[in-house]
Swiss-Prot record:
Belongs to the cyclin family. Gene3D superfamilies: Cyclin-like. It comes from Arabidopsis thaliana. This is Cyclin-J18. Keywords: Cell cycle, Cell division, Cyclin. The gene is CYCJ18. InterPro entries: Cyclin-like_sf, Cyclin_N. The lineage of its organism: Eukaryota, Viridiplantae, Streptophyta, Embryophyta, Tracheophyta. GO terms for biological process: cell division; regulation of cell cycle. Pfam families: Cyclin_N (PF00134).
Amino acid sequence: MSTEIGHLRRRLVEFLIQSTTLLELPPIVKYSALSLFFDRFRPNLVRFLQKKKAEHWLLQPLNESNLQLFVLISIWISCKMHCTRGLSVHSLKSFGDKVITEQLFMVRDFLDAELVFLKVLKFEIGTLNIAYTRLEDLLIQFKEVAKVGEQLNFEACMDMMDLLYEKEDTSLLYQSSKSLAASILVSSYIITVPKQQYEFPILPWVKMVTNKEEREVVELVEYILAHVLYSNSP
């Protein structure tokens, strides 16, 4: 089962990102949903299915359509936490009818799926310390101390975060959100800030505000940039 989900990982990541874009949801919803589904729901699902009480038709079989349903549930839960006006279950169901093409789910299925999702997570849905929120905080601090921070492209940061979720090995970086946020900030600095303006000592500054060793950050930056450049190559 884990292998099957792994095989679908890239498509599910793209499905989640496209769904949040079509729904015009803010980035915090997207990254909270990515964290809920890929960092928590998926890893805990195997253990959950090993329990007899875990039997549920939405999990048996666990095909792509059912997984897409749970992806929408992760977005729904994230939206409830971060949006002033959350999605209604009827709005979500209507959206699901458009984007899940292989199966039609009823409103009751969405409500059942939400409960199953929460049970798999043991109702632990906090997202305050995900890499995205740490990155936002770092960028705010960076702009306060360095004028060049205004030139750092936050869209590039988000593009890198999206790419890192596509593969199992790179997504493991999200287990250390502080290190990842610092490394993505430095990576975006290298890519988007004009070289002639590299006057700010960004590595010593990152070390000061995150307590992360420069060597650790440099190694992660090299790994991230290699992955990003490889992913964008023909």
